[in-house]
Swiss-Prot record:
Lineage: Eukaryota, Fungi, Dikarya, Ascomycota, Saccharomycotina
Protein name (record): Repressed by EFG1 protein 1
CDD domains per record: CAP_PRY1-like
Species in which this protein is naturally found: Candida albicans (strain SC5314 / ATCC MYA-2876)
A molecular function GO annotation: cholesterol binding
Keyword hit for Secreted: yes
Gene3D superfamilies associated with the record: CAP
Gene name of the encoded protein: RBE1
A GO BP entry: sexual reproduction
Record function comment: Cell wall protein involved in cell wall integrity and which plays a role in virulence.
Subcellular localization(s) per the UniProt record: Secreted, Cell wall
InterPro entries tied to this protein: Allrgn_V5/Tpx1_CS, CAP_dom, CAP_sf, CRISP-related
Biased composition, class Low complexity, residue ranges: 67-118
GO CC field: cell surface; extracellular region; extracellular space; extracellular vesicle; yeast-form cell wall
Residues bearing carbohydrate: N254
Domain SCP: 128-244
Amino acid sequence: MKITNTLLNAAALLAVTEAATITKFFTASTQTLFVTQTSQTVVATKSFVETIYSAPPKQLTSKTQDSTSPTTSSVNSLTSSSATSYVETTTPAPSSSTLTTSTISSSTASEDSDATPTADVEFAEEILKEHNVKRALHGVPALSWSNKLAEYAQDYANTGFDCSNLNLKHSGGPYGENLAAGYMGGISPVDAWYDEISMVDWNNVDFTESTGHFTQLVWRSTTQVGCAKMMCSTAWRQITVCEYLPRGNVIGLNVTSGHSYFVDNVLPPLK
């Protein structure tokens, strides 16, 4: 009888233990019980573009003024406190993050202009052609290719970006500069920049943060371009860097013409 009672007690203990386990399982939160997982990884691609704006060069001083370099889609600009002290020259203002005004001889405004790109000929020909296709729509002269600008662009494309946490930050060099990420080849970056035409107010052509790539692209007094690309992360794909000389997006009054630099250099499409 004692053995029977012992066996019954053991069986009861086992039943309680199993019941407790079952109770714990079925009272678990639904968040724990129902976890779904996708069987296929989807890679999202990203893209954005960036440009810079600068004040026109000032002839009578060599004072440097600091300015915060733009990031993501924001841009900054500098306007003259005295528009009449600025005159149009063929020399670009020297920096995106630091805007410098100085007396520069016009002979320094020209970089080497070479018909044959030094690297990635197919990309260079494609992106130069697309620049000039867009410029022709506005009746402004075609750009010529500069190996020096392209080499500068390539150096910055190779060293200026962290693909694990991409931030399109400008080089701060002496040229106009357009940046893009996520657009492949030589045509799609230019098309993305040109698409900003839809946001231009042709009754009041001026600086805006949303149209700077377009205005640099068609800037009449710009004569040379050099571009480069760098393959980045899977998400961002290609980074595109284009350098321009003389640089565009100059803010201020051209005392020679009596118009703003934007009115003189950003022309509406031909009809």
